[in-house]
Design a protein with these regions (language model features):
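N-terminus-centered regions that define maturation/targeting leaders and the start
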Residues: 18-173
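Sec-dependent N-terminal signal peptides
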Residues: 3-15
Length: 173
């Protein structure tokens, strides 16, 4: 029994380690300030992102960025979609600054990236990278929720990078 339990624990930890994706940015570290350059006060261009440890069997990568700290008086859901990208090749090592693949409509109703621009205080910006086992070529998604619904049950691994931004303090200057 002890041997069986030991084997099961080893398999569990080996599987978890194999499915861990690294998502980083040369522009900022996890839970640190996003530089002004990438905001509405700067060039409003997307930061470079790096990917590592993509699991075997991945058909495509999907990336989302959203702000869950929007005052509910401005947006009842409290979430604002800043960027979502799909059709990223499985062998990709990242997205260059200002780059992307197929990009959906951000919270302003326009396709592409829109940088941090909080109306009140410091907000958190969640970048999420998903490795999926289905191709998404030729598909269009009206919003982040539709994309996330399409990949449910097909996520092999995921990672998260959180950036912070406070417009009033001019982060990253």
């Amino acid at each position: 029994m002890k041997k069986l339990l030991s084997v099961m624990v080893t398999i569990l930890f080996t599987s978890a380690a194999a499915s861990a994706i690294d998502l980083t940015s040369p522009a900022f570290k996890n839970n640190e300030k996003i530089p002004v350059k990438y905001s509405c006060d700067g060039e409003n261009t997307s930061p470079a992102l790096n990917f590592n440890n993509i699991p075997a069997g991945t058909k495509q990568l999907v990336l989302t960025m959203h702000d869950p700290d929007v005052p509910k008086t401005l947006l009842p859901s409290g979430n604002f979609d800043h960027w979502f990208v799909w059709d990223i090749p499985a062998n990709s090592k990242g997205i260059p600054e200002g780059g992307g693949a197929k990009m959906g409509m951000n919270g302003t109703g326009k396709p592409g990236y829109i940088g941090p621009c909080p109306p009140d205080r410091q907000h958190r910006y969640f970048f999420r990278l998903y490795a999926v086992d289905i191709p998404l070529q030729g598909k269009m998604f009206k919003d982040r929720a539709a994309l996330e619904d399409a990949i449910k049950g097909h996520i092999l691994a995921q990672s998260e990078l959180i950036g912070l931004f406070d417009k009033a303090k001019k982060s990253g200057q």
